[in-house]
Amino acid sequence: MKNLLIISILLISLDVFSQEKFETNKQGSEYKFKVLKDLEATDVQDQGRTSTCWSFSSLSFFESEIIRLKNERHNLSEMFIARNAYMGKAENYLRMYGTFTFGPGGAFHDIPWVIKRYGIVPEEVYKGLSYGSATHKHSEMEAVLDAAVKALAKKPQNGKLTPVWKIGIEGILDAYLGELPSDIEDFNFTYQGKEYNPKTFSKSLGLNMDDYISITSFSHHPFYSQFVLEVQDNWAMQSSYNLPLDEFMNVMEQAIMKGYTFAWGADVSEKGFGYRDALAIVPEDESTIQKSGKDSKRFNDAGAIRVSNAFVSPVKERNITQEDRQIAFDNQETTDDHGMHVTGLVEDQNGTKYFIVKNSWGESNDRDGYFFASFPYVKYKTLNIQVHKDVLSKDLKKKLRIK
């Protein structure tokens, strides 16, 4: 009788194992990923030919937060964020006499910066497509805005700025992205049968922008302190909390396991970043990866073509240290390329863990716009993350002086 019981338990265990869900990165791949956690997210979007990944990724993160907090699904307007951030960039640029950053890039904390000041609207209310295109293309608008702020910085009229310079910049943004009233509370719209303006709609979502923090890991500043991450797109000069690498990785892993997604900023120009192959890895021998063509950073094409068996069969990856990470940042091999959204966690047949990453380049690979980023890749090439502060343990909050 005892033997029969043991056999029954073994058979049940085998049946459960055979039914266990495994994923792979692409057709024909030998990678087998066991799903450890797969959190809800809204539909994959396409940023088009724009450098607004920071807006797409952070808003995707906040859309998942709304699902987590209220079990509601909303598609929020990335171009409403980008448009209002442009005004902030223009003002900063001119206050610094044209010596500061002005451009289409941005950072995760720009989204709270905009929402606190202007609110937010659904995508259907403000699509940002007023130039006869079905997809986002900003090269002309970027050129016009750049020329305008550079001209203003020279103060051509009596050596000072006129009171209407902001109206001029707003006029350019109105033309390309769509008009907004000068008082944002006058922008009234109906959504799902209710009347809102951007601020009342923002309030209805149940998000407290003060609950969200940026975290990074670099040794050129003291750990457990805050510092302004030295990347060009950090125009608002906002700070990130600095953690040792192992703790940083633990925060990311525990966030997912606790049910929290996070926005992820990273370098995506490495040989091992194979979006077409739905895989980001750091092979111990990178010479096995052949790369042809040029990476179009931040845009919605997959960049250079990468060919390697490493994308179809697991290979040994580098053991990334804090020093490796710092050297790559200091020598500018690691660059501030792209914002994405981490929504889950998997483990391959060799025990290596990977984050599930939602991109904003449309459903343009075998994973319908998602890919898997190995822990070594994330250790090596992460710039920073945006996450809810309650992901942190009480002890870590105390160390960082977060209430």
Residue spans of the language-model regions?
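Generic hydrophobic-segment detector
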Residues: 3, 8, 33-36, 43, ...
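Sec-dependent signal peptide cleavage junction
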Residues: 16-31
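Bacterial Sec-dependent N-terminal signal peptides
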Residues: 1-20
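Active-site nucleophile-adjacent alpha helix/oxyanion-hole segment immediately C-terminal to the catalytic cysteine
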Residues: 28-263, 365-367
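Active-site signature of cysteine proteases
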Residues: 20-22, 167-403
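Extended low-complexity acidic/polar segments
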Residues: 1, 99, 107-108, 116-119, ...
